[in-house]
């Protein structure tokens, strides 16, 4: 019984010290921490000292403008261009969560994004393109962008293979 207690106490102490080291490590990798839903320049400037990388929700409009907004039916008339200007001047990376990417607009988006990266001299490696539509997202991957497929389930690792196939078919 003493051995079990000793092992238990040793594990708790070990876990405690591991937590201290892990917490200390968080500050050592600021490039791994992203500011989520940075959908206003005010929020970007407010948190710019702490975060060098940020995620922005965008909708691609009929006039080939990337509109910064979370909801397709809402616009605040904020273009993505100030964000490109910001990372051109200050460094960092930009995660674009595209809310309406599909096979009908992917070519126009690629053209517009190529123009923006060229105009602001931003390498593709500094961007992450996210969408729920894996087929359209594949085109971004083929063009050399880092991509992220959004899966809208709480625990995607617990999905059965049939559920994964069903989701992929719907996307």
Segments predicted by a language model, with ranges:
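Phosphate-group recognition and catalysis centered on beta-loop-alpha active-site segments
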Residues: 2-171
């Amino acid at each position: 019984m003493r051995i079990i207690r000793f092992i238990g106490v040793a594990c708790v102490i070990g876990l405690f010290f591991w937590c201290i080291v892990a917490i200390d490590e968080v500050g050592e990798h600021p490039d791994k921490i992203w500011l989520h839903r940075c959908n206003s320049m005010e929020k970007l400037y407010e948190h710019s000292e702490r975060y060098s990388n940020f995620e922005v929700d965008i909708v691609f409009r009929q006039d080939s403008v990337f509109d910064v907004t979370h909801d397709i039916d809402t616009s605040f008339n904020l273009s993505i261009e100030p964000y490109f200007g910001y990372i051109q001047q200050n460094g960092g990376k930009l995660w674009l969560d595209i809310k309406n990417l599909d096979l009908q607009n992917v070519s126009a988006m690629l053209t517009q994004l190529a123009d923006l990266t060229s105009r602001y001299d931003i390498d593709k490696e500094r961007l992450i393109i996210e969408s729920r539509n894996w087929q359209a997202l594949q085109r971004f991957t083929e063009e050399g962008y880092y991509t992220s497929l959004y899966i809208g389930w709480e625990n995607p690792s617990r999905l059965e293979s049939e559920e994964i196939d069903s989701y992929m078919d719907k996307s």
